[in-house]
C-alpha cells in the first residue's frame, strides 16, 4: 500500500502492527521501522513509468509513519532506511512492535452458541476494499489511479482509545476471543471467532451511507475490533467501551450450526 499511497500506507504499517498484539490484549510500547528505497536524489524525470518518484515515497511515507506514531504516543526506537536500485520497482515498508500484558488480563475460551460478537471502535467505509489481494497482486501502469481505495485510512486517536480499553482488566476479562480487522474485513475478523455465526451486516456502523453488503463484508477500514463475549456480559462490556468514548455494537451471534451466514 505504501507504493500506491505512501502516507496512508506507512501509517497503516504501524497501525496494523499495533492491532495484531492488541487483539491478544497486549499493550504495545515500542516499535521498529525498516524500509527500502531506490536513490531518492534521482531526478524526477527518471522515475519509472507508473511509479511515484522515490523522493516522494521516502518523504511522504516517513511523514505518514511519524504522524500515526505521534498521535498514538508510540516511541520508535529503531529506524533504518536501505537504499538499493532493486527497490525502484517496489518499495519495502516493514514495521515491528513489542507489546506485553499481565497474564491475569487474558481470558481465552471457545465462544459458545448464544454468545454475541461486538464490533468495537471505528466505523466502516470503502477504504481498504480489496486491500488483501491488492498487496499481493501485480501492479500495472494504471495502478496509481485505480488502486488508491485499497489503502486503509488510519485513525490513530481511535486506536489509542482501544488501547486504553484493553488495559482495563475488568473489560479484558469479559472477552472470550478477539480479532483485529485486517485482510477480509468483517468476513474474516468475525468469521474466525467461531465455527457457527449469524452476522447482520445492517448493524455494522458506517462512515457514510451507500455501502452495499459486499463492501460492508470485506472493507478493511482500520481501528476496529471484533470481540466475542457471553450475551449476559455484552451490556457491561459496551458500558466500559462507552467510558473510553468508543462505539460498540452487537453485529453477530454464535450459532450451533457450523456455518457462517451474513445477511444484508
Where are these regions (language model features)?
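Glycine/proline-enriched, intrinsically flexible loops and inter-domain linkers
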Residues: 1-264
